[in-house]
Amino acid sequence: MEALGMIETRGLVALIEASDAMVKAARVKLVGVKQIGGGLCTAMVRGDVAACKAATDAGAAAAQRIGELVSVHVIPRPHGDLEEVFPISFKGDSNI
């Protein structure tokens, strides 16, 4: 199973900038975006652990330049049950 990288921002523009930076910085796939409320937005990427770490680092830096970065986290091996509850499944070709 691949790692899961997440970035949460306050504001959609910062999240879009962070998402763009993440997919450009490493071989990751953007698998979800969620607007939570109160201006909070989260983007999720999947890839190997190193790629998710590089992507979230780049995304965090980009978000901080544009708006407010709230949180960044990488789960190296998310449990399979998470995919049944949260929209984090990697669906697509294997050469991301």
Curated annotation (Swiss-Prot):
Gene3D superfamilies: 3.30.70.1710. Disruption phenotype: Essential, it cannot be deleted when the 17-gene operon is otherwise intact, possibly due to polar effects on downstream genes. Not required for cobalamin-dependent degradation of ethanolamine (EA) when polar effects are removed. A double eutD-eutM deletion is also not required for growth in the above conditions. A double eutM-eutN strain grows as well as wild-type on EA and cyanocobalamin, but a quadruple eutL-eutK eutM-eutN strain does not grow. It comes from the Bacteria. Its main location: other. Artificial BMCs can be made in E.coli by expressing eutK, eutL, eutM, eutN, eutS (eutSMNLK) or eutS alone. Cargo proteins can be targeted to them and beta-galactosidase (lacZ) was active within the BMC, showing the BMC allows passage of substrate into the interior. This can lead to the development of tailored BMCs for specific metabolic reactions. The addition of eutQ to the eutSMNLK construct results in biogenesis of multiple BMCs. Can incorporate into the pdu BMC where it alters growth, suggesting fine-tuning metabolite flux by using different BMC components is possible. Keywords: Bacterial microcompartment, Virulence. CDD domains: BMC_CcmK_like. Homohexamer with a central pore of up to 8.6 Angstroms diameter. The hexamers pack into a two-dimensional array. Interacts with EutQ; a probably cytoplasm-facing helix (Val-49 to Gln-64) interacts with N-terminus of EutQ. This is Bacterial microcompartment shell protein EutM. It comes from Salmonella typhimurium (strain LT2 / SGSC1412 / ATCC 700720).
